[in-house]
Amino acid sequence: MIQVIVTDIEGTTTDIRFVHQVLFPYARERLTPFLRAHQQDDDIAALLVDLRREIAQPDADIETLITVLHGFMDEDRKSTVLKAIQGIIWRTGYLQADFRGHVYPEVAQQLADWHQQGLKLYVYSSGSVAAQKLLFGYSDAGDLCPLFSGYFDTHVGAKRDVSAYQKIANQLGIAPQALLFLSDIRQELDAAQLAGWHTCQLIRDLPDNDSAHPQVNRFDQIVLSLFTE
């Protein structure tokens, strides 16, 4: 029996175009002036120390680090430091109502239904936990944060690594066979499945013919009773 549902965001709860056409450009445009202005702030300074360690350049100046981060964005690298800085920049956008977090029309109601049924809901995304909370807290369906019991990001590992799903299960204290992971990416689901989880693939566009995972087009097509131990 499924006790816990863990969901991805991009392409799963949220249109990938919102991330790539709204969030990413917003952060890219503001990254350079933001870091120049706030490099001495405690939280930013700590992240820059982590970035110097990540690139093995302990003496890199701020302009070098800015160039590195722009390169990471060009590569769509899942850098924990980059994701944290993007999240801090996005916070301003949400608070100023420059945009609201997109969720597909059926997502909010289905999450609420599962929550009411007593299921525990979590998020696992490459975006920082802070960014996840902002997207759901300022979503176009209202504040969805009360529906979630917790959030995971790349601090537990990359989403295509089996060990990340093992860590999440251990942290939750839940047997893998009671966990269901929702994602649009087959390779992420492969990793979760190898960790013993149940999986379901969200297909918002064309079907993934190379996938062996159950596929649905909407959250309200997910039938939990089909996922048995």
Curated annotation (Swiss-Prot):
Its EC number is 3.1.3.77. The keyword Endoplasmic reticulum does not apply. It is an enzyme of class 3 (hydrolase). One of its GO terms (molecular function) is acireductone synthase activity. It catalyses: 5-methylsulfanyl-2,3-dioxopentyl phosphate + H2O = 1,2-dihydroxy-5-(methylsulfanyl)pent-1-en-3-one + phosphate. Its cofactor is Mg(2+). Belongs to the HAD-like hydrolase superfamily. MasA/MtnC family. Monomer. Bifunctional enzyme that catalyzes the enolization of 2,3-diketo-5-methylthiopentyl-1-phosphate (DK-MTP-1-P) into the intermediate 2-hydroxy-3-keto-5-methylthiopentenyl-1-phosphate (HK-MTPenyl-1-P), which is then dephosphorylated to form the acireductone 1,2-dihydroxy-3-keto-5-methylthiopentene (DHK-MTPene). This is Enolase-phosphatase E1. It comes from Yersinia pseudotuberculosis serotype O:1b (strain IP 31758). The gene is mtnC.
